């Protein structure tokens, strides 16, 4: 393998990871059509992902340490996964995704209080830009208020809030527990998502098992999604550890492109001009945030790209 190909592999890893996250909503809808609810799908796919990480990276289990931040990571990962899965199953995929992508605004606020990072004027401006984009997208002449109009959109918003918190807590864990490998933080994320999804499914009621041949199909899809989630996280961690943070953030935005295209092809969802404009503000804020925060720790210190994980599909 020549140097040019080897050098492009980390970028390709992030690109593939973003594409997978942009497409994963579709098999979740197939599961829903087979009778597997969003909460149950969240629990089962996360359980498969958790087991996959534990088995594939079993040598890192010895680095697991206790800290109060780990339950926080587990809970926020659970809310993130459940909100994203439920929202993309029951709502307009692109709108849910864009509400989720308000993450930079919430991250700036959380990091100020939990990581003692100074909230600069630039950071506050980017937060305002992304929130303004969401208000533009959500504004309706009939409703009069720029608020999520459906439970699915509220779920997407909650997922973004929780994802931002889980990101901040993962960074804090990497600082407090530098000896704990990133794979164990990823396992904590998936384990928390599995437990939270299982608890939530109890309140939703136990659905009837898919009948006949549908049961085998549902099991195969659940296992495939879970393994894909875990593999995708490990793949993206490989890329983020070797690509500058500002460049990686730009590549990750490809997820929105894939989401928009797949929503158009598979769900016949076409955003309005106002939704495109609001989405553009959110994407721009995400893009610029990588430049505002481009002063990242050195790759051999805690908090580098290897700490990045996403316990959601």
Where do the PLM segments sit?
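C-terminal transmembrane-helix exit sites in multi-pass transporters
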Residues: 57-58, 103-128, 257-276
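Helix-helix packing/entry segments at the starts of transmembrane helices
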Residues: 98-102, 173-192, 229-265
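Specific transmembrane alpha-helical segments of multi-pass solute transporters/efflux pumps
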Residues: 23, 60-95, 136, 227-243
């Amino acid at each position: 393998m020549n140097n040019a190909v080897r050098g492009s592999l980390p970028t390709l890893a992030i690109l593939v990871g973003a594409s997978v996250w942009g497409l994963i909503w579709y098999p979740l809808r197939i599961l829903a059509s087979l009778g597997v609810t969003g909460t149950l799908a969240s629990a089962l796919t996360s359980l498969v992902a958790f087991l996959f990480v534990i088995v594939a990276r079993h040598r890192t289990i010895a680095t697991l340490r206790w800290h109060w931040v780990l339950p926080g990571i587990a809970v926020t990962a659970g809310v993130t996964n459940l909100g994203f899965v439920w929202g993309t199953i029951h709502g307009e995929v692109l709108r849910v995704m864009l509400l989720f992508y308000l993450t930079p605004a919430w991250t700036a606020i959380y990091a100020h209080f939990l990581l003692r990072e100074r909230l600069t004027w630039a950071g506050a401006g980017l937060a305002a830009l992304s929130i303004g984009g969401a208000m533009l997208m959500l504004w309706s002449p009939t409703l009069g208020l720029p608020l999520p109009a459906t439970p699915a959109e509220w779920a997407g918003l909650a997922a973004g809030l929780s994802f931002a918190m889980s990101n901040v807590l993962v960074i804090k864990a990497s600082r407090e527990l530098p000896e704990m490998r990133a794979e164990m933080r990823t396992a904590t994320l998936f384990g928390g998502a599995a437990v939270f999804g299982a608890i939530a499914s109890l309140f939703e009621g136990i659905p009837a098992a898919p009948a006949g041949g549908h049961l085998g199909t549902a099991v195969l899809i659940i296992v495939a999604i879970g393994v894909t989630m875990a593999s995708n996280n490990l793949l993206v961690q490989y890329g983020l550890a070797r690509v500058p943070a500002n460049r990686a953030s730009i590549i990750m935005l490809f997820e929105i492109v894939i989401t928009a295209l797949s929503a158009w092809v598979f769900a016949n969802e076409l955003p309005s001009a106002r939704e495109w404009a609001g989405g553009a503000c959110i994407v721009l804020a995400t893009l610029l945030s990588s430049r505002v925060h481009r002063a990242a720790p050195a790759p051999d210190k805690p908090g580098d790209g290897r700490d990045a994980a996403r316990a959601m599909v």
